[in-house]
């Protein structure tokens, strides 16, 4: 009985959340709408990231897949920590969720580019492992 009640509550909660969800309207410059749009932008970037990741794992052997999985998990941890740090000043404010979403979107889009470049590497191209690096920009 308890299990059925809990399931019913979850279904009602999901339905209520879906009914309250708003779509992005870029002509509305209220903070609430900017937060919604930034969240949708991040969701789109995350979908592109998942596709780029899947494309790369499909081309890797077992060891490559394992190493990519470890790298991706570490990158996600870094991304989340970096965005938490870089948006800490706005914590508690109405703009905070937008800033977090924008940070997540920016870093996620950068990662999509990295994964896409790695998926297009030719075997033996040692410079392809780190796309976009310019040796002239090395930190001294």
Residue ranges and their predicted role:
Residues 1-9:
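Bacterial N-terminal signal peptides that target proteins for export
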Residues 14-18:
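N-terminal signal peptide c-region/cleavage motif recognized by signal peptidases
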Residues 19-140:
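N-terminal alpha-helical modules
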């Amino acid at each position: 009985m308890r299990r059925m009640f809990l399931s019913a509550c979850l279904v009602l909660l999901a339905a209520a959340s879906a009914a309250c969800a708003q779509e992005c309207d870029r002509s509305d410059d209220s903070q609430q709408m900017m937060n919604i749009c930034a969240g949708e932008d991040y969701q789109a970037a995350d979908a592109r990231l998942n596709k780029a990741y899947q494309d790369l794992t499909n081309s890797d052997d077992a060891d490559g897949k394992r190493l990519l999985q470890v790298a991706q998990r570490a990158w996600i941890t870094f991304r989340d920590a970096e965005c938490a740090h870089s948006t800490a000043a706005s914590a508690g404010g109405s703009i905070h969720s937008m800033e977090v979403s924008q940070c997540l979107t920016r870093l996620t889009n950068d990662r999509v580019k990295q994964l896409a470049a790695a998926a297009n590497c030719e075997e033996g191209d040692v410079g392809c492992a780190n796309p976009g690096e310019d040796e002239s920009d090395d930190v001294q």
